[in-house]
From Swiss-Prot:
The protein's name in its UniProt record: Large ribosomal subunit protein uL15
Subunit: Component of the large ribosomal subunit. Mature ribosomes consist of a small (40S) and a large (60S) subunit. The 40S subunit contains about 32 different proteins and 1 molecule of RNA (18S). The 60S subunit contains 45 different proteins and 3 molecules of RNA (25S, 5.8S and 5S).
GO biological process, one term: translation
GO MF term list: RNA binding; structural constituent of ribosome
Keyword Iron-sulfur on entry: no
Subcellular location(s) of the protein: Cytoplasm
Start-end of Basic residues biased regions: 1-13, 21-42
Primary localization class, coarse: cytoplasm
Gene Ontology cellular component list: cytosolic large ribosomal subunit; nucleus
Keywords recorded for this protein, A-Z: Cytoplasm, Ribonucleoprotein, Ribosomal protein
Gene: RPL28
Pfam families given in the database record: Ribosomal_L27A
Stored InterPro entries: Ribosomal_uL15, Ribosomal_uL15/eL18, Ribosomal_uL15/eL18_sf, Ribosomal_uL15_CS
Region (Disordered) residue spans: 1-44
Organism, as annotated: Candida albicans (strain SC5314 / ATCC MYA-2876) (Yeast)
Length: 149
């Protein structure tokens, strides 16, 4: 934009240049610095700086994330961890000697929950945590639960 078209050029010849007669563009009309964040500048802070005011909880020093790592898997999805080639073999035999060993930890799951039904085939489940209902259902089909660290 050429200088001759700017607003400051258009204000030339007018004493206050659009800045008013009394205050004359002096002092601090909105307060100094970040004043009025909860009062007359509230809309700006709410829109552009949410969470600026208010309390924040305590930090957890030396938090070991692994203590809270517990992805869950339900019983109805447990057989998806068995290889598809071997799955048909296990389901047809259904003998306790040839029970599949499902290591949930190796597949990235920390806890077994009891939603769903299991096929009537014994299975050995290795997990860090198992819910009471899941353990009952696994035992009901002749399976075993092994807790691993």
């Amino acid at each position: 934009m050429p200088t001759r078209l700017t607003k400051t050029r258009k204000h030339r010849g007018n004493v206050s240049a659009g800045k008013g007669r009394i205050g004359k563009h002096r002092k601090h009309p909105g307060g100094r610095g970040k004043a009025g964040g909860q009062h007359h500048h509230r809309t700006n802070l709410d829109k552009y700086h949410p969470g600026y005011f208010g309390k924040v909880g305590m930090r957890y020093f030396h938090k070991q994330q692994n203590h809270f790592w517990r992805p869950e898997i339900n019983l109805d999805k447990l057989w998806t961890l068995v290889d598809s080639e071997k799955k048909d073999e296990y389901l047809s035999k259904s003998s306790a000697s040839a029970a599949p060993v499902i290591d949930t930890l190796a597949h990235g799951y920390g806890k077994v929950l009891g939603k769903g039904r299991l096929p009537e085939v014994p299975v050995i489940v290795k997990a860090r945590f198992v819910s009471k209902l899941a353990e009952e259902k696994i035992r009901a089909v002749g399976g075993v639960v092994e807790l691993v660290a």
